[in-house]
Amino acid sequence: MITLDYRNKENVEVDSSLHNESRSASAFRSKKEARRYWIVLITLIALGLLSSYGLLVYNNPVPIDSPSFIPVVKRRIVAIVAMIIAAVCHSLSTVAFQSITNNKIITPSLLGFESLYSAIQTSTVFFFGASALINFNGIGSFLFQVVVMVFMSLILYGWLLSGKYGNLQLMLLVGIIIGTGLNSVSTFMRKLLAPSEFDILQARLFGSVNHADPAYFPIVIPMIIIVAVLIFAHSKNLNVLSLGKDVATSFGVKYQPSVIYTLVLVAILMSISTALIGPLTFYGFLVATLSYQAAATYDHRYIFPMAFAIGFLIMTSAYFLMYHVFHAQGVVSVIIELFGGIIFLTIVLRKRAL
């Protein structure tokens, strides 16, 4: 039997590389990575604010000393607020959704929110005409769309995630099937529309901050703040859930209730963003993918702020470049979706497997 005399320091060998000053028991592997995180985050926020300032005052047709300058800026502030809402909703929901599914290439769009939004808009034009779609606005119509999308997701979760044989992968599969079916029905109805009705509908189906009505903000902003705080407070559980069901269960996390709780919060954020701005399929994926690379940590307390900063910068810089550099007044979301789709295909082709 071999015994060690721990009273004699010469008999104990300590690996000094594990206890140097550059390493610490935190979300980052070293203090250098922590400093890098904060530098990147502050830089992204500063660039986002600079782009926002450019959108507000650059190329403003009204002089600053004119009484009409403030009203013009106020109208532009509405677009900035809509960009912040889109960044919060898509960044938080996509990162949380990818964590509970343990898959970095899928997005909450698989649950059919955008397909349902498209079906609601298309059926309104198809059955009641373009005038009904134009009049389909106000707080009542907005809340109706949000409630319908959240209600559909709750039915999906309660049906496929409850019980002994609840399965997250089955829920995703059913969500894809429902989304595909709704898209097929919407496409069929759009083919039967008159050209003028189709043009009006198509403008609604492209995601744009110009669709945002400031009358919705007093309802939307408090809802988003509450949900964002709840998701951020859920960060430690998401850290464990991202390791998989078996590991999360072994750590004492109630897997099924935690997943359903997260999915409900994701559904609320996605429903609000889709009803307010419109569909943005690959925007959340683009933001989440870049945030993982920039944050260099698996701690959601740090991933969420980085994702929001990147999402806000993408939105503000894209609109600034398209409006004031390229002078293209088209739908900026198409460009964002294009880059998001290219990155998605690149990652899929590089991994060769989902």
Swiss-Prot record:
Keywords: Cell membrane, Ion transport, Iron, Iron transport, Membrane, Transmembrane, Transmembrane helix, Transport. It is a multi-pass membrane protein. Gene3D superfamilies: ABC transporter involved in vitamin B12 uptake, BtuC. SUPFAM superfamilies: ABC transporter involved in vitamin B12 uptake, BtuC (SSF81345). The chain crosses the membrane at residues 37-57, 77-97, 116-136, 141-161, 168-188, 214-234, 259-279, 302-322, 329-349. Disruption phenotype: A mutant lacking both fpuB and fatCD permeases is incapable of using petrobactin as an iron source and exhibits attenuated virulence in a murine model of inhalational anthrax infection. One of its GO terms (biological process) is siderophore-dependent iron import into cell. It is found in: Cell membrane. The keyword Transmembrane applies. The keyword Cell membrane applies. GO terms for cellular component: plasma membrane. One of its GO terms (molecular function) is transmembrane transporter activity. Part of an ABC transporter complex involved in ferric-petrobactin uptake. Probably responsible for the translocation of the substrate across the membrane. Belongs to the binding-protein-dependent transport system permease family. FecCD subfamily. The complex is composed of two ATP-binding proteins (FatE), two transmembrane proteins (FatC and FatD) and a solute-binding protein (FpuA). This is Petrobactin import system permease protein FatC. It comes from Bacillus anthracis. The lineage of its organism: Bacteria, Bacillati, Bacillota, Bacilli, Bacillales.
